[in-house]
Amino acid sequence: MASQYSVRKVGAPYTLEHRVYIEKDGVPVSPFHDIPLYANAEQTILNMVVEIPRWTNAKQEISKEELLNPIKQDTKKGKLRFVRNCFPHKGYLWNYGAFPQTWEDPNSIHPETKAKGDNDPLDVCEIGELVGYTGQVKQVKVLGVMALLDEEETDWKVIVIDVNDPLAPKLNDVEDVERHLPGLIRATNEWFRIYKIPDGKPENQFAFTGECKNKTYAMDVVRECNEAWERLITGKTAPGGVSTTNVTVQHSSSRVAPDQLPPLPPNENLPPAPIDSSIDKWFFISGASA
């Protein structure tokens, strides 16, 4: 499947000004609202938006608040956020991103995790062999899901693989991941458990004692979050600070014609700004398994 999507990069990476906009056939679109969740009629292949390529550290995410929801680097107290390297890991273990047209509703408490949603699109870990790029739209299939409890919020992590990956035909459920990629599920659990410790935070907790639930459970989570997004985009749920402006969702009162949007800055494709060498430091966490 050739991608219809391209990226427009504004500002230099690793700066507060950096934004990655998504365009479809040259028209700016929202990666949150305009890219369809499902890539085929059978709803077995899904679109994901890559925010953070594997082995990188910059914590980039779809901006919920900004017009057209560009991808930007997250900040804390005005400083750009980077995840630390917890031995033996380097940056993120997977191509990390989000499912479009999904939302973890902060007004809703999940009956099994007993925690509310985290007010973000659904997080996705793509485990294929190719390193993606920020703003890439991949076609993936769902394999399983973990439920991280992050500061008393449910933060689902859906495990997927690019349908074009050589291993994709062999991976159809979570037990196939363990069979063909032994250790990856355990390492994924460990990574999410410890990654905030170098920043002085406690280790994260999981629902289901850290178990990775199977594909059927994961697809139910995806559907629930898609339904929550439907309520958001149609105004049945108050958006809070979320920008719901879009150019394609016919039944949304926030839809605008592309020519009504303010012009975006031109594509710049600037070299990355220098980052502090401490980002490369390895942190050794007691209780982490090598």
From Swiss-Prot:
Mg(2+) 1 binds at D118, D123, D155. Keywords: Cytoplasm, Hydrolase, Magnesium, Metal-binding. InterPro entries: Pyrophosphatase (IPR008162), Pyrophosphatase_sf (IPR036649). Transmembrane segments: none annotated. One of its GO terms (molecular function) is magnesium ion binding. Mg(2+) 2 binds at D123. It catalyses: diphosphate + H2O = 2 phosphate + H(+). GO terms for biological process: phosphate-containing compound metabolic process. Its cofactor is Mg(2+). PANTHER family: INORGANIC PYROPHOSPHATASE. Belongs to the PPase family. This is Inorganic pyrophosphatase. The gene is ipp-1.
